[in-house]
UniProtKB/Swiss-Prot annotation:
Interacts with RNA-directed RNA polymerase 2a. Its EC number is 3.6.4.-, 2.1.1.-. Residues 756-908 form the (+)RNA virus helicase C-terminal domain. Involved in the virus replication. Contains a helicase domain and a methyltransferase domain. The methyltransferase domain is probably involved in viral RNA capping. Involved in the formation of ER membrane spherular invaginations in which RNA replication complexes form. Residues 47-341 are annotated as: Methyltransferase. This is Replication protein 1a. InterPro entries: (+)RNA_virus_helicase_core_dom (IPR027351), Alphavirus-like_MT_dom (IPR002588), P-loop_NTPase (IPR027417). SUPFAM superfamilies: P-loop containing nucleoside triphosphate hydrolases. One of its GO terms (biological process) is mRNA modification. Belongs to the bromoviridae replication protein 1a family.
Amino acid sequence: MDSAALEKMTGAKFPAVQGVIEEFSRDRVQNVLGDMRSRQVIKYAVGLSEASVQELRFNWPCFTWEEESVPLPPHPFAAYSRRAFTRWAIAQCGPVPIKDFGGNWFLHWQWQTGVHSCCPLLNPRDGAHQTRRELNMESYLRTHGPKYDKFNELSRPDLCHHRAEDCSVRAKAALSVDSAYDMGLKNTCKAMHRAGIELLHGNILFDPDMLIEAKMEGFVAGMNYHWKKTRRSTGLMSSFLEMGSSLFGVSNSSKEGEGHHDLKIKMGSSSTHMVPADWEISYHFRDDCVLGYTHNLADVLSIATGSYVKVGNTFYELERTGLKSGMLMYTITACKGLYDRASARSTPLSAKASTVIINGMSYQVGEKLDPISFPYLAASFYMQAQKAVFEVQQVVDLHTPNRNLWSWFKKKFELKAHAFLFALGLRDSHDEWLLDQIEFELNETVCTLPGEFLEPVSEVERLDAALEDWRRDRERLNGKSVENLKTLTVLVELAKKLGISAYEVLNSHQNESERPKDQWHVEAALFEAVELERAHWKMLTAEAQAMSLQDPLSREAKSKGWSYESSDSLPCAYAYVFSEGRFVKPADLKKKTRVLVSPSMQIMNQIRMAESLEKAIAMNVKSCKKTWIDGVAGCGKTYEIVHTADIFKKDDLILTANKKSQEDIFSQLKPGTDCAKRIRTVDSYLLKPDVQAKRLFIDEAGLVHPGKLLAAMRFAECDDCLLFGDSEQIPFVNIVESLQPAKFLKLEVDAREVRETTYRCPADVTATLATLYKKKKIVTKSKVLKSVTSKSLASASAVSGLDPHSWHLTMYQADKAELVRVARTNQMDDVWIKEHIKTVHEAQGISVPHVKLYRFKTFDQPLFDAAHAEAYRLVAISRHTQSFTYIGVNQHLCKADRMLKFVICQIP
């Protein structure tokens, strides 16, 4: 790409373009040019209302909006929104051949974009549009023609009158500006496949209320249009339209049944509502009594609720990227090769029950939703139920003799549907063989089983009967109350002792100066930890009742429903396990018995943890000196623990906040088996505090609730406790929304030591960390000067592979799930996935050579954008020793991204 090409592409002169090309990569130049192309001037008529102008500027801040003395176009706000979207989409596509499906060829000719327009004449309205554009072109030439030295400086309009799916012109990218109404998702993808198009940007007028059955009509204030659902008329108007279509020599695809299919959607009730091909939706603009549009309802809803279409060997994935003033924007991306879990993604719900895809964006359970997304959420729930029914039917169809049961489990359900073993009723002759293959200790998971022919249930009646028995038994499963009277009793006793109510123990600082400060804070922090564990238990069991008990055959249901009761006699918190052909309670088993569990089963130790913390409250308090080692990122806190603690003499005990930190210490110490009890996680030690020590070392102490830290000190009966962490990195995070932590998250310590030298962070990162750290300084010993880069993606689906030598981080679990999907598509090993793909919260404490941080959404995300989330960004940028790459979707749209601002400052 030379300077002349750049000048022609952007319409501007660049004296130093050649130097820019030499300094930056081709990708970066194209990104800069795309942003410059999008920052163009769009002129609007003087008569446009001020409110409309302000909304246009808010929706499209990348353009400069200027007045001009021209007549107002029909439905002006919609027209200018369409114009802005067209320019924005062209800029996103970059300097590649582009097609416009049914677009305005006059605008492309006027702007000299070189876009090919497919403008089929399907009815009289299309003919009127064609005539109007020809007149506009003639008027434009009369007005602006004299300024061109030669007429041939203006190229001829690049258009055809073929349908997009019939056009033979090839391209790399495409636009679909208000054109998908007549094509639907299926025909749009067919048109992309024929033309070799890899990326399409499109929009339609859409109101979420269209998904609700009771809403047969509505009004969208932004675009100022009415919509109404009707059945196709067979009267005089229908005859007139058919006659008009025949005059142009073409027939409407909806008349011939092309590109239309019955679409099941959720319309505000529990019943299934079919949308046959004769249902239509009409649009009428309030500020234009003449113009109106009628389209096939199924085609419109295919864009609003669809996910992917397979054409040949190519999958086309649809992502809805935004809803602006009644305009739904979306992208369709071609995915070559195997598409992982494509059958599961055919609905708006993802492959995990905790993740739902709404309006093209994935949300994790607990994330806040914009109210505009609620109708999408209702549609997603409906599609989830439909998929569960489909999967049950799949299972019934597979219940035939001589079927390879293990292959069926592995390929169809990946050991997540352990409830099937209960419902299938394995043949008695194979029970002993099955148990021999899965002999392991409690808390283990099933290893790879050899292929073996087993005979599942072949009678549907037996399957239904077994499931009905299981459903009737739910009261017994849910019989135990999670309330713990002992907890309430001790709480009341402490309240009486302090002279205040039980509520004030956890939520008030009144008259604090009159109480022994240290004792009061210690006991209050311990009680808060107890209440958090109990609230966490309630949250998980409530989720299990809502998800798992509905249908034991549903792959989407997390199998937390099996864990309702705890057992003090076993180191296993599963409430029910599969053993000897049936589900039984662990309390009824021997300690070394054989059991079957699955990766979806969750250990629930909350009640046992609460009981352990209560024991710590009742213990006699032993004085312990608490020292906080406050070190910057990469200062060698773990190294100091390893070389200071002497666990072989059994005088020291090392506890860590997570399993990864424990494994890191093990790998450096290489201790014998006798040391295993002295290098543990905090939770493991609190559940079984069977060793004591004079000195207690706690790594990443800031991630643990202070109540648990104090309980560990009491159980260890230590004289000194050294707490290692960074007071300005991620602190303890409460995941239980029903119980907000009180004011005891700050641990009172006797001494504080500071470590200000980092051996990990490169110089450019250290310079920024110096501005982020408020309580301490930071200097580096690293010889790496520059380590930070960035990369912008068109969409999340553009991530086709992962660097096996890098660690891949995300801020949110939903983005992590997307990376895991990509890794499994590329046949990455599960051990590698567990080690190399983490959230930033999970990665706190690690030190690795190369890090890539991903952001897949362009709307506001607090951990990237909010000022109060500096701790997360501090952790993210301080994990690497050599390189850090920030990868985001459409980064130029993320104006509030504080992480991106940091990265831009570091790039030379």
